[in-house]
Regions:
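Acyl-donor (CoA/ACP) binding surface of acyl/acetyltransferases
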Residues: 1-29, 43-150
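Short loop/turn motifs at secondary-structure junctions and domain boundaries
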Residues: 37-43
Length: 150
């Protein structure tokens, strides 16, 4: 996995960028599992999400397929108090800018569960279209796609 080391992308007080030096102390539960997988995953690219200067979560591209130009997206905010404030929507919008401006990817995909309405709202606000059920879980999984326009 590549951990972003370049400039931060900003939208007001929200930004995505490189992790702080003591990364593991700031990431939400489960994120450390992604980091431990880093050496064996060349198909991942991750950012830390910041609210002002405070790390609040992560957002990443994973299962990046350079041949098809597609990538899945994962994201999480650590504290419940950080949810419902638009941070996830802004972080996803910033990731879309990064992808459009610096990669050759042509499609981003979010797979979420039917009961994760917050993730569905984030996807819709950022222009992702619901394209149907997921192959892995057709009863509960929902697929949202965004075509990169340059």
């Amino acid at each position: 996995m590549t951990i972003h080391a370049g400039i931060r992308y900003h939208d007001g007080d929200v930004s995505i960028g490189a992790p702080p030096p003591d990364t593991e102390a700031h990431l939400p539960l489960g994120a450390n599992e992604w980091l431990r997988a880093a050496p064996s995953r060349a198909d991942m690219y991750s950012f830390v999400v910041y609210d002002d200067e405070r790390p609040v979560g992560y957002i990443l591209l994973h299962d990046i397929d350079q041949q098809t130009g597609e990538s899945l997206i994962g994201y999480a905010l650590a504290a419940p108090s950080d949810r419902g404030r638009g941070l996830g929507t802004k972080a996803l919008g910033l990731l879309q800018l990064f992808v459009r401006d610096t990669t050759r990817l042509t499609k981003l995909i979010i797979i979420t569960s039917r009961d994760n309405e917050a993730s569905q709202r984030i996807a819709a606000k950022c222009g992702f279209l619901h394209t149907g059920p997921s192959r892995e879980d057709p009863l509960n999984g929902m697929v949202f796609e965004w075509v990169v326009r340059r």
